[in-house]
Amino acid sequence: MERYDRQLRLWGALGQDSLNRSRVCVVGPATPLLQEVFKNLVLAGISSLTWLKVECAVQSGSLFLAELKKDLEPLASKQLEYEENDLRKTLQQPQYDWTRFSVVILTCIGEQTAMLDLNEIRRQRGTKFPPVLNTFVSGFYGYIYLVLSETHFVLQAHPDSKKYDLRLQNPWPELINYVDTFDLSKMDTATFSGIPYTVLLMKCIAKLERDGNNGRITIDQMKKVLDQICLPLGNDVIYEPNYVEAKRYAYLACSQNDCCKELEDLLRNLEISDYGNDWHDTYNYEILTLLLTLKNIAKENGELSFQPLTGTLPDMESTTENYIRLKKLYEVKAKLDKSRVEESLARSKKIVSQDVLETFCSHYGEVRKILPPKSDLLGIFSTSNALLDALVMVQFWEQPAVTAEDKDEFIGLRVDDNYSVMAFFGGAVVQEAIKLITHHYVPIDNLFLYNGINNSSATYKI
């Protein structure tokens, strides 16, 4: 069946293609949680699945699908590639190819020896081992623990509030010339109403600079100067939509840097290999290559930094002619910046796919990074979180180690076959897997805990 349009809106054609080409390994016993994980993986478009089975004394229950492959096939968008193997036998095969998997998902692993062996294999493979999502559910509680082997880069974070890259404090010559074509002193109110608010904000910044303000611009300063340059046209100006927008978005002019600085800090302070064979995920390597390319461009031109303009302009009150002229300036500048990146890549003989390059340049401000944790798969054994400790005790020793004070709080730990919570975690862990595969949205960093008794959740870094 065809994928829903919603999926393409969430992570785009590039993300969906990554899902279609990915391979996911699910490790664990036959539980409703594992069934939910498989179902959600197939519905997302992942059609290459491996199940490393763990024998478990606990019955899978009547809700578990009798023939997993047969029941999953109708949900798949193409021929389902599916294999089952025994985990213990697989762990004893030194040549087993773990690197072929995009993500490894552990579901309700209750054997300490299996976890220890898998952790040792992961340590030996180093950065070539895929990301691991370890999840466990008991009663009304559960956790998801992400362990990365290499730095994970998010190509498009999709923040809740979109911040446009307008370069109000760092305009290029063509944009300055465009702003200078508007002489407010010779305008009437009708002509003024057709000016984009970004032009008004840049005129305010220019006036502040002429007045000797070389420090950080504040919102109050912007609003005060806006009144100084606009009110001479008449008191009715304050009712014009573009003036109202300029007041509302005055804060956009108060940022020295329109794009996030954390990526520059990463490149400045972090030593990570730019050798392709050291990376498990090609996209991570390509995004790193692009970040290093930006650094090289800045160095070659004696600039503090170089950030490609995204070229996206928000809707605003303006005449059609003024808006189209402004939009074209941003689009032309974005193409020029992208060309500079392509030329630098060619000189360095680095290869990056065109789709990744275009997405990177058009959403540079949304690029994020997550560093591998200092802990490994065994990190869940050495925390001071009472709920996680209780879950781990149930998972590996089948007995919660809780104090008298915690006994009432964790009363829901021993509820068997809580399918609703397992279904929730099946969706949640696959959501994190999709984030890792598509490089869209920011994954958890790196522990997610859920308490179904009081309906609360939290993330921690361990």
From Swiss-Prot:
GO CC terms in record: cytoplasm; ubiquitin activating enzyme complex
Record carries keyword Phosphoprotein: no
Family annotation (InterPro entries): APP-BP1, ThiF/MoeB/HesA, Ubiquitin-activating_enz
UniProt keyword annotation of Coiled coil present: no
Domain of life: Eukaryota
Pathway: Protein modification; protein neddylation
Gene Ontology MF terms in the entry: ATP binding; NEDD8 activating enzyme activity
GO BP annotations listed: protein neddylation
Summary of the function given for this chain in its UniProt record: Regulatory subunit of the dimeric UBA3-ULA1 E1 enzyme. E1 activates NEDD8/RUB1 by first adenylating its C-terminal glycine residue with ATP, thereafter linking this residue to the side chain of the catalytic cysteine, yielding a NEDD8-UBA3 thioester and free AMP. E1 finally transfers NEDD8 to the catalytic cysteine of UBC12.
Complex and partners: Heterodimer of UBA3 and ULA1. The complex binds NEDD8 and UBC12.
Entry similarity comment: Belongs to the ubiquitin-activating E1 family. ULA1 subfamily.
Name listed for the protein in its UniProt record: NEDD8-activating enzyme E1 regulatory subunit
